[in-house]
Swiss-Prot record:
It comes from Haemophilus influenzae (strain ATCC 51907 / DSM 11121 / KW20 / Rd). Signal peptide: none annotated. Its EC number is 6.1.1.2. This is Tryptophan--tRNA ligase. One of its GO terms (molecular function) is ATP binding. It catalyses: tRNA(Trp) + L-tryptophan + ATP = L-tryptophyl-tRNA(Trp) + AMP + diphosphate + H(+). A motif ('KMSKS' region) lies at residues 195-199.
Length: 334
Protein backbone atom coordinates (compact mmCIF):
# COMPACT_ATOMS: atom_id res chain seq x y z
CA UNK A 1 0.00 0.00 0.00
CA UNK A 2 1.36 3.41 -1.00
CA UNK A 3 2.29 5.75 1.82
CA UNK A 4 0.43 9.09 2.02
CA UNK A 5 2.47 11.98 0.64
CA UNK A 6 3.72 14.81 2.84
CA UNK A 7 5.18 18.07 1.52
CA UNK A 8 6.88 20.82 3.48
CA UNK A 9 9.68 23.33 3.06
CA UNK A 10 11.87 25.94 4.71
CA UNK A 11 12.99 29.28 3.33
CA UNK A 12 16.77 29.82 3.12
CA UNK A 13 16.46 33.23 4.74
CA UNK A 14 17.58 33.84 8.29
CA UNK A 15 19.14 31.19 10.50
CA UNK A 16 16.96 28.27 11.59
CA UNK A 17 16.05 28.31 15.27
CA UNK A 18 15.35 25.74 17.97
CA UNK A 19 11.71 26.59 17.27
CA UNK A 20 12.13 25.39 13.68
CA UNK A 21 13.79 22.20 14.92
CA UNK A 22 11.45 21.34 17.79
CA UNK A 23 8.32 22.47 15.99
CA UNK A 24 9.03 21.18 12.49
CA UNK A 25 12.26 19.42 11.56
CA UNK A 26 12.19 16.88 14.37
CA UNK A 27 8.62 15.94 13.48
CA UNK A 28 9.62 15.59 9.81
CA UNK A 29 12.28 13.06 10.75
CA UNK A 30 9.69 10.94 12.56
CA UNK A 31 7.27 11.18 9.64
CA UNK A 32 9.72 9.51 7.26
CA UNK A 33 8.71 6.07 8.55
CA UNK A 34 5.00 6.42 7.83
CA UNK A 35 4.83 8.88 4.92
CA UNK A 36 6.37 9.50 1.53
CA UNK A 37 8.10 12.74 2.45
CA UNK A 38 8.99 15.54 0.05
CA UNK A 39 11.06 18.29 1.65
CA UNK A 40 12.00 21.45 -0.21
CA UNK A 41 14.30 24.42 0.29
CA UNK A 42 11.93 27.13 -0.92
CA UNK A 43 14.29 29.67 -2.45
CA UNK A 44 11.63 31.13 -4.76
CA UNK A 45 9.61 32.14 -1.71
CA UNK A 46 12.72 33.66 -0.12
CA UNK A 47 13.16 36.31 -2.83
CA UNK A 48 9.78 37.90 -2.05
CA UNK A 49 12.02 39.80 0.38
CA UNK A 50 15.30 41.23 -0.94
CA UNK A 51 18.18 38.77 -0.54
CA UNK A 52 21.92 39.14 -0.99
CA UNK A 53 22.77 36.64 -3.79
CA UNK A 54 25.92 35.31 -2.12
CA UNK A 55 24.14 34.93 1.21
CA UNK A 56 21.16 33.21 -0.44
CA UNK A 57 23.37 30.58 -2.11
CA UNK A 58 25.16 29.90 1.19
CA UNK A 59 21.91 29.76 3.15
CA UNK A 60 20.38 27.30 0.67
CA UNK A 61 23.21 24.82 1.23
CA UNK A 62 23.13 25.52 4.97
CA UNK A 63 19.45 24.53 5.12
CA UNK A 64 20.15 21.36 3.17
CA UNK A 65 23.00 20.42 5.53
CA UNK A 66 20.75 21.13 8.51
CA UNK A 67 18.03 18.90 7.04
CA UNK A 68 20.58 16.09 6.90
CA UNK A 69 22.05 16.85 10.33
CA UNK A 70 18.58 16.73 11.88
CA UNK A 71 18.03 13.26 10.45
CA UNK A 72 16.20 13.76 7.17
CA UNK A 73 17.44 10.89 5.03
CA UNK A 74 17.71 11.33 1.22
CA UNK A 75 17.25 7.56 0.89
CA UNK A 76 13.85 7.85 2.57
CA UNK A 77 12.74 11.34 1.50
CA UNK A 78 12.90 13.52 -1.60
CA UNK A 79 14.99 16.61 -0.84
CA UNK A 80 15.42 19.39 -3.40
CA UNK A 81 15.62 23.12 -4.06
CA UNK A 82 12.41 24.73 -5.29
CA UNK A 83 14.01 26.63 -8.20
CA UNK A 84 15.45 23.36 -9.56
CA UNK A 85 11.92 22.18 -10.41
CA UNK A 86 10.36 24.67 -12.88
CA UNK A 87 6.97 22.97 -12.62
CA UNK A 88 6.40 24.92 -9.38
CA UNK A 89 6.20 28.24 -11.18
CA UNK A 90 4.39 26.75 -14.17
CA UNK A 91 1.59 25.41 -11.99
CA UNK A 92 1.57 28.59 -9.93
CA UNK A 93 0.66 30.64 -13.01
CA UNK A 94 -2.25 28.37 -13.86
CA UNK A 95 -3.52 28.50 -10.27
CA UNK A 96 -3.30 32.30 -10.34
CA UNK A 97 -6.05 32.20 -12.93
CA UNK A 98 -8.32 30.31 -10.53
CA UNK A 99 -7.61 32.48 -7.49
CA UNK A 100 -9.46 35.68 -6.65
CA UNK A 101 -7.86 39.01 -5.82
CA UNK A 102 -10.08 39.39 -2.77
CA UNK A 103 -8.86 36.08 -1.36
CA UNK A 104 -5.25 37.18 -1.57
CA UNK A 105 -6.08 40.58 -0.09
CA UNK A 106 -7.28 38.90 3.09
CA UNK A 107 -4.03 37.03 3.76
CA UNK A 108 -2.74 38.23 7.13
CA UNK A 109 0.90 37.35 6.39
CA UNK A 110 0.87 39.69 3.37
CA UNK A 111 -0.44 42.49 5.58
CA UNK A 112 2.20 41.80 8.22
CA UNK A 113 5.10 41.61 5.76
CA UNK A 114 3.88 44.65 3.84
CA UNK A 115 4.08 46.66 7.03
CA UNK A 116 7.53 45.30 7.82
CA UNK A 117 8.97 45.65 4.30
CA UNK A 118 7.11 48.76 3.20
CA UNK A 119 9.88 49.71 0.75
CA UNK A 120 9.38 46.49 -1.23
CA UNK A 121 5.71 45.49 -1.41
CA UNK A 122 6.04 43.37 -4.54
CA UNK A 123 3.57 41.20 -6.45
CA UNK A 124 5.51 38.07 -5.48
CA UNK A 125 4.84 38.79 -1.81
CA UNK A 126 1.14 39.25 -2.56
CA UNK A 127 1.07 36.05 -4.63
CA UNK A 128 3.10 33.97 -2.16
CA UNK A 129 0.14 31.76 -1.11
CA UNK A 130 -0.55 30.71 -4.71
CA UNK A 131 3.04 29.55 -5.18
CA UNK A 132 2.72 27.70 -1.88
CA UNK A 133 -0.46 26.09 -3.19
CA UNK A 134 1.43 24.98 -6.30
CA UNK A 135 4.24 23.56 -4.13
CA UNK A 136 1.74 21.35 -2.31
CA UNK A 137 -0.70 20.40 -5.07
CA UNK A 138 2.06 19.53 -7.53
CA UNK A 139 2.94 16.43 -5.49
CA UNK A 140 -0.63 15.40 -4.56
CA UNK A 141 0.33 15.87 -0.91
CA UNK A 142 -2.22 14.52 1.55
CA UNK A 143 -0.67 16.10 4.65
CA UNK A 144 1.23 19.34 5.14
CA UNK A 145 2.96 19.97 8.48
CA UNK A 146 2.51 23.68 9.18
CA UNK A 147 2.56 26.02 12.14
CA UNK A 148 -0.44 28.04 13.19
CA UNK A 149 0.88 31.03 11.21
CA UNK A 150 0.60 29.06 7.95
CA UNK A 151 -2.89 27.64 8.48
CA UNK A 152 -4.51 30.39 6.42
CA UNK A 153 -2.26 29.63 3.46
CA UNK A 154 -3.16 25.95 3.58
CA UNK A 155 -6.84 26.81 3.75
CA UNK A 156 -6.56 28.88 0.55
CA UNK A 157 -4.67 25.96 -1.03
CA UNK A 158 -7.64 23.73 -0.25
CA UNK A 159 -10.04 26.33 -1.68
CA UNK A 160 -8.08 26.62 -4.93
CA UNK A 161 -7.83 22.83 -5.29
CA UNK A 162 -11.55 22.32 -4.65
CA UNK A 163 -12.43 25.07 -7.14
CA UNK A 164 -10.21 23.54 -9.82
CA UNK A 165 -11.51 20.03 -9.16
CA UNK A 166 -15.11 21.23 -9.37
CA UNK A 167 -14.41 22.49 -12.88
CA UNK A 168 -12.21 19.71 -14.24
CA UNK A 169 -12.59 16.59 -12.09
CA UNK A 170 -10.35 15.16 -9.40
CA UNK A 171 -7.05 16.57 -10.59
CA UNK A 172 -5.68 17.50 -7.16
CA UNK A 173 -5.56 15.73 -3.81
CA UNK A 174 -7.07 18.00 -1.16
CA UNK A 175 -4.35 18.48 1.48
CA UNK A 176 -4.95 18.33 5.21
CA UNK A 177 -3.20 20.23 7.97
CA UNK A 178 -0.72 18.22 10.02
CA UNK A 179 0.44 19.99 13.17
CA UNK A 180 2.90 18.16 15.38
CA UNK A 181 2.05 18.19 19.08
CA UNK A 182 5.44 18.36 20.75
CA UNK A 183 7.08 21.74 20.47
CA UNK A 184 4.65 23.04 17.88
CA UNK A 185 4.84 26.54 19.36
CA UNK A 186 8.22 27.60 20.76
CA UNK A 187 7.92 31.24 21.71
CA UNK A 188 10.25 34.24 21.73
CA UNK A 189 12.59 34.36 24.73
CA UNK A 190 12.04 38.07 25.40
CA UNK A 191 8.44 38.29 24.22
CA UNK A 192 6.80 34.92 24.99
CA UNK A 193 3.45 36.10 23.65
CA UNK A 194 4.76 35.68 20.09
CA UNK A 195 6.29 32.74 18.26
CA UNK A 196 10.08 32.41 17.98
CA UNK A 197 10.94 33.47 14.44
CA UNK A 198 14.15 33.23 12.44
CA UNK A 199 13.31 36.60 10.89
CA UNK A 200 13.10 38.38 14.26
CA UNK A 201 15.23 41.53 14.24
CA UNK A 202 15.93 41.17 17.97
CA UNK A 203 18.40 38.28 18.09
CA UNK A 204 17.96 37.97 21.87
CA UNK A 205 14.52 36.52 21.13
CA UNK A 206 15.86 33.46 19.31
CA UNK A 207 18.32 30.61 19.70
CA UNK A 208 19.64 29.46 16.33
CA UNK A 209 20.72 25.93 15.51
CA UNK A 210 24.28 27.02 14.71
CA UNK A 211 24.75 29.26 17.74
CA UNK A 212 27.71 28.79 20.08
CA UNK A 213 27.03 27.41 23.60
CA UNK A 214 28.04 30.60 25.43
CA UNK A 215 25.56 32.65 23.42
CA UNK A 216 22.84 30.03 23.97
CA UNK A 217 23.35 30.07 27.74
CA UNK A 218 23.44 33.87 27.84
CA UNK A 219 20.16 34.26 25.94
CA UNK A 220 18.28 31.60 27.88
CA UNK A 221 19.44 32.97 31.24
CA UNK A 222 18.10 36.38 30.17
CA UNK A 223 14.77 34.92 29.06
CA UNK A 224 11.65 36.61 30.41
CA UNK A 225 9.89 34.85 33.30
CA UNK A 226 7.73 36.81 35.78
CA UNK A 227 7.93 38.64 39.10
CA UNK A 228 6.01 36.15 41.25
CA UNK A 229 7.27 35.97 44.85
CA UNK A 230 8.15 33.34 45.70
CA UNK A 231 8.91 32.06 42.17
CA UNK A 232 6.66 29.23 41.06
CA UNK A 233 7.65 26.97 38.17
CA UNK A 234 4.21 26.14 36.83
CA UNK A 235 2.84 25.64 33.32
CA UNK A 236 0.28 28.41 32.76
CA UNK A 237 0.43 29.95 29.28
CA UNK A 238 -2.05 32.72 30.10
CA UNK A 239 -0.47 33.98 33.31
CA UNK A 240 3.11 32.66 33.16
CA UNK A 241 3.98 32.75 29.46
CA UNK A 242 7.75 33.01 29.91
CA UNK A 243 8.01 30.14 32.40
CA UNK A 244 5.65 28.04 30.27
CA UNK A 245 7.84 28.63 27.22
CA UNK A 246 10.95 27.46 29.07
CA UNK A 247 9.07 24.35 30.22
CA UNK A 248 7.93 23.72 26.64
CA UNK A 249 11.51 23.91 25.39
CA UNK A 250 12.84 21.66 28.16
CA UNK A 251 10.03 19.14 27.67
CA UNK A 252 10.59 19.03 23.91
CA UNK A 253 14.36 18.58 24.23
CA UNK A 254 14.29 15.97 27.01
CA UNK A 255 10.98 14.24 26.12
CA UNK A 256 9.92 14.63 29.76
CA UNK A 257 6.23 15.44 30.35
CA UNK A 258 5.48 18.97 31.58
CA UNK A 259 3.90 17.58 34.76
CA UNK A 260 7.13 15.76 35.63
CA UNK A 261 9.16 18.92 35.09
CA UNK A 262 6.81 20.92 37.33
CA UNK A 263 7.47 18.41 40.13
CA UNK A 264 11.21 18.44 39.43
CA UNK A 265 11.41 22.22 39.82
CA UNK A 266 8.93 22.57 42.67
CA UNK A 267 10.30 25.02 45.22
CA UNK A 268 13.23 25.99 42.99
CA UNK A 269 14.18 29.37 41.54
CA UNK A 270 13.72 30.39 37.92
CA UNK A 271 17.50 30.39 37.59
CA UNK A 272 17.53 26.63 38.16
CA UNK A 273 15.03 26.16 35.33
CA UNK A 274 17.00 28.42 32.99
CA UNK A 275 20.27 26.60 33.72
CA UNK A 276 18.64 23.25 32.98
CA UNK A 277 17.18 24.55 29.71
CA UNK A 278 20.51 26.09 28.66
CA UNK A 279 22.43 22.89 29.44
CA UNK A 280 20.02 20.61 27.56
CA UNK A 281 19.74 22.89 24.53
CA UNK A 282 23.53 23.32 24.35
CA UNK A 283 24.05 19.54 24.46
CA UNK A 284 21.48 19.04 21.71
CA UNK A 285 23.02 21.73 19.50
CA UNK A 286 26.61 20.53 19.98
CA UNK A 287 25.71 17.14 18.52
CA UNK A 288 23.63 18.65 15.72
CA UNK A 289 26.36 21.15 14.79
CA UNK A 290 28.98 18.43 14.55
CA UNK A 291 26.83 16.57 12.02
CA UNK A 292 26.03 19.82 10.20
CA UNK A 293 29.70 20.65 9.60
CA UNK A 294 30.42 17.14 8.31
CA UNK A 295 27.71 17.54 5.67
CA UNK A 296 28.32 21.22 4.93
CA UNK A 297 32.01 20.62 4.19
CA UNK A 298 31.15 18.06 1.51
CA UNK A 299 29.56 20.15 -1.25
CA UNK A 300 29.93 17.33 -3.77
CA UNK A 301 27.62 15.23 -1.60
CA UNK A 302 25.17 18.13 -1.24
CA UNK A 303 25.13 18.75 -5.00
CA UNK A 304 24.45 15.06 -5.67
CA UNK A 305 21.59 14.97 -3.17
CA UNK A 306 20.02 18.05 -4.74
CA UNK A 307 20.40 16.73 -8.28
CA UNK A 308 18.89 13.36 -7.43
CA UNK A 309 16.14 15.00 -5.39
CA UNK A 310 15.21 17.35 -8.23
CA UNK A 311 15.04 14.43 -10.67
CA UNK A 312 12.67 12.53 -8.37
CA UNK A 313 10.58 15.63 -7.71
CA UNK A 314 10.31 16.54 -11.40
CA UNK A 315 9.10 13.07 -12.35
CA UNK A 316 6.16 13.42 -9.96
CA UNK A 317 5.60 17.11 -10.72
CA UNK A 318 5.44 16.55 -14.47
CA UNK A 319 2.66 13.99 -14.04
CA UNK A 320 0.46 16.50 -12.21
CA UNK A 321 1.29 19.37 -14.54
CA UNK A 322 0.42 17.26 -17.60
CA UNK A 323 -3.02 16.53 -16.11
CA UNK A 324 -3.56 20.22 -15.37
CA UNK A 325 -2.50 21.33 -18.85
CA UNK A 326 -4.79 18.77 -20.47
CA UNK A 327 -7.68 19.78 -18.20
CA UNK A 328 -7.48 23.47 -19.09
CA UNK A 329 -7.07 22.77 -22.81
CA UNK A 330 -3.40 23.43 -23.55
CA UNK A 331 -1.99 21.69 -26.62
CA UNK A 332 0.51 19.07 -25.48
CA UNK A 333 4.12 19.55 -26.59
CA UNK A 334 5.20 16.78 -28.99
Amino acid sequence: MAKPIVFSGVQPSGELTIGNYLGALRNWVKMQEDYECIFCVVDLHAITVRQDPVALRKATLDVLALYLACGIDPNKSTIFVQSHVPEHTQLSWVLNCYTYFGEMSRMTQFKDKSARYAENINVGLFDYPVLMAADILLYQAKSVPVGDDQKQHLEITRDIANRFNALYGNIFTIPEIFIGKAGARIMSLQDPEKKMSKSDDNRNNVVTLLEDPKSVAKKIKRAVTDSDEPPVVRYDVQNKAGVSNLLDILSAVTDKPIADLEKEFEGKMYGHLKTAVADEVSTLLASLQERFHQYRNDETLLDNILRQGAEKARAKAQETLAKVYEAVGFVAAK
